[in-house]
Amino acid sequence: MLNLSPLFFTTLDDESCMHDELDLTPGQRAWIASARTDVRDCLRTGIPRVLRANGYTEDVPQPRFFTQGSWAYKTLNAPAQHPQQADVDDGCYLPMSFVSQTKRPSTAATVFFAAAEEALKPLVEERRWKLVTDKPTCIRIVIAAYAHIDIPLYAIPDEEFVTLAKASMERYGYDSLTEAVNMAERDAWTALPADKVLLAHRECNWMSSDPRPVKEWFLGEVEAKGEQFRRVVRYLKAFRDWKWSSGGPASILLMAAAAPLFEKRDRRDDLALLDVVAALPARLRGGVNNPVEESESLTERLGQAGVEDAAKAFEEFEKVLRGATGAGSPSQACIWMRGEFGPRFPNEPDRVKVVSVAATIAAAPATAGPSELVGRTKAG
């Protein structure tokens, strides 16, 4: 049998591995971080300025920010092919008491979107970025061919707004306002929970949606299962991004589906990935729910045809991955893996190890081990 793990992950600086190839370059990460800081600064001063200019006489609070999604989970992969982009989610929060000063929630949602977009315009024009305003739950700023920043807008309970920690890094259409005011009869703040985080939505006004529990859940899974679990999630995303140039199963779906399937395999990322991939099709077909909100189906979002498409893709992937680990030729194994992951998988058959069946079995732990510390210095 073959041990392909050195080509998936290594801690040796002078050897390449797919895990490192999935990272954005240091220059790209620095550019994104700098752009995010500039966007935050722009919104921090710009939203209060725009609102005051449009008649809000009361003291307008500065928004707070909370990074969510793959940048926060350390599962962000560089794009695999055009037109993919690295997606950085940076939530923008205002306190509920301020947002609910408007008579109707729909008005408040529209005002929040419009104020943020108006505030961002000078920065976007100066940097020659692109402002995308047709996403229902966020404002998107395309900052480079390889990356964009998504800014979802939230109303948060006042006491949580006060305690929300600041991150360590740092078309105003009146027609649509009129439309919003005239929308739904149920358009009253009393219909919305005052103790929940609400996400502004361009069509649905506000939705109960708090990104923080998902982040806490995933980081808790990594703490319990070790860094190998985080790497396996990144490999699943890498396969998806090579298989589907757009679409495919969402990252949160892959994370939630993989978590109960994962078993730590000592220094064998290839086998840890194979364990998950082998069980993934049945798990997808059986339905996967949000791990922090069981009433929310993640597979439903993908649709029945999308779920079946993904399940079949992972069935084929499992055959290839199992065939590669059982192959007699390291060169053939590398060719097969590059077919599944693209050129980011190293074509270095001389680093593939031939191992016995007994050694492969020994890589599986009898019991769950402690949190893995090796590799935490590397970007993940």
From Swiss-Prot:
The keyword Metal-binding applies. Its EC number is 2.7.7.-. Induction: Part of a CBASS operon consisting of capV-cdnA-cap2-cap3. ATP binds at residues 140, 209. In bacteria expressing capV-cGAS-cap2-cap3, this protein is conjugated to about 130 cellular proteins by Cap2; more conjugated protein is found in the absence of Cap3. Disruption phenotype: Deletion of the capV-cdnA-cap2-cap3 operon (plus neighboring gene Q024_03603) results in about 10(4) higher titer of phage PaMx41 in this strain. There is a cross-link at residue 380 (Glycyl lysine isopeptide (Gly-Lys) (interchain with K-? in acceptor proteins)). It holds the Pfam family DncV_C. Primed for activation by Cap2 which conjugates it to cellular proteins. GTP binds at residues 68-73, 237, 251. Cyclic nucleotide synthase (second messenger synthase) of a CBASS antivirus system. CBASS (cyclic oligonucleotide-based antiphage signaling system) provides immunity against bacteriophages. The CD-NTase protein (CdnA, this protein) synthesizes cyclic nucleotides in response to infection; these serve as specific second messenger signals. The signals activate a diverse range of effectors, leading to bacterial cell death and thus abortive phage infection. A type II-A(GA) CBASS system. Catalyzes the synthesis of 3',3'-cyclic GMP-AMP (cGAMP), a second messenger in cell signal transduction, from GTP and ATP in response to phage infection. Its product controls the activity of cGAMP-activated phospholipase CapV, a phospholipase that is a direct cGAMP receptor encoded in the same operon. Belongs to the CD-NTase family. A01 subfamily. This is Cyclic GMP-AMP synthase. It comes from Pseudomonas aeruginosa (strain BWHPSA011 / Pa011). The lineage of its organism: Bacteria, Pseudomonadati, Pseudomonadota, Gammaproteobacteria, Pseudomonadales. The gene is cdnA.
